[in-house]
């Protein structure tokens, strides 16, 4: 679980790169110190790259994007109007038919209703079945391109 959360929280290098390119940046934890008007403009955080999943002895089905989405579940729990999704631009994620996964503030509740604990599914590397149970898989079909993975946090501000 720590490696998945690190993926979600490890933004410093991307932040510096964006600043070096002259882009305007904001850290989410700083928004509470800013004005309400400036916070209203934050609508999406987009990241690219590819994460690594280190499989243990026990593993189910899923890919790195599905694991990232499942790892976001406890971070999003109870948040309104905020979601996270991550997908492979080639339309496949790991050895599955899904391109990636989706989670929002209600995903934890929906998983609990299905009897699935996100931490257990992550430990077993079985994000596919966990997300499938709550309709949290993203499907695009093969795209014919493979640029990178794309992860997005959407915030209705």
Language model segments and positions:
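A glycine- and small/hydrophobic-rich beta-loop-beta segment
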Residues: 1-70, 74-78
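Internal helix-turn-beta structural module
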Residues: 61, 70-157
């Amino acid at each position: 679980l720590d490696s998945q959360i690190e993926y979600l929280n490890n933004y410093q290098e991307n932040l510096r790169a964006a600043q070096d390119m002259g882009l305007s940046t904001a850290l989410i934890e700083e928004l509470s110190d800013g004005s309400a008007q400036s916070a209203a403009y934050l609508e999406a955080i987009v990241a690219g790259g590819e994460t690594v999943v280190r499989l243990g002895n026990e593993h189910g089905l899923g890919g790195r994007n599905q694991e990232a989405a499942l790892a976001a579940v406890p971070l999003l729990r109870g948040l309104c109007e905020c979601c996270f999704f991550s997908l492979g631009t080639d339309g496949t994620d790991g050895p599955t038919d899904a391109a990636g996964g989706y989670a929002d503030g209600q995903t934890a509740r929906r998983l609990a209703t299905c009897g699935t604990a996100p931490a257990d599914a992550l430990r077993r590397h079985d994000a596919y079945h966990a997300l499938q149970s709550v309709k949290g898989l993203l499907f695009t079909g093969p795209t014919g391109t493979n640029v990178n993975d794309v992860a997005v946090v959407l915030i209705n501000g």
